[in-house]
Amino acid sequence: MAYRESFYRYLMTQRDADSSDEIAQFANNAQHDLTFPKQEQDYEKLSDYLELNASYLPSMYIFDRAYRMYEDKMMY
């Protein structure tokens, strides 16, 4: 089975403190979330966590977009 990095690790590649992009802002904020499930890959588990704990995420649509990008990258 091929190695698949965690969503958090992928998300950290999207950080950009100077960007106004929503995914970059999500990544910037997630970096400071000490309880973010850093080893998780599962969409449902991540979604549940974010819905309950991520007040810094203005819309779950941003997570959905970021997760689709993550899935696309993991296919290669």
From Swiss-Prot:
TM spans (from-to): none
Disulfide bonds: none
Annotated InterPro entries: UPF0346 (IPR010673), YozE_SAM-like (IPR023089), YozE_SAM-like_sf (IPR036806)
SUPFAM superfamilies noted in UniProt: YozE-like
Family statement drawn from the similarity comment of this UniProt entry: Belongs to the UPF0346 family.
Protein name: UPF0346 protein lhv_1069
Provenance organism: Lactobacillus helveticus (strain DPC 4571)
Organism ancestry: Bacteria, Bacillati, Bacillota, Bacilli, Lactobacillales
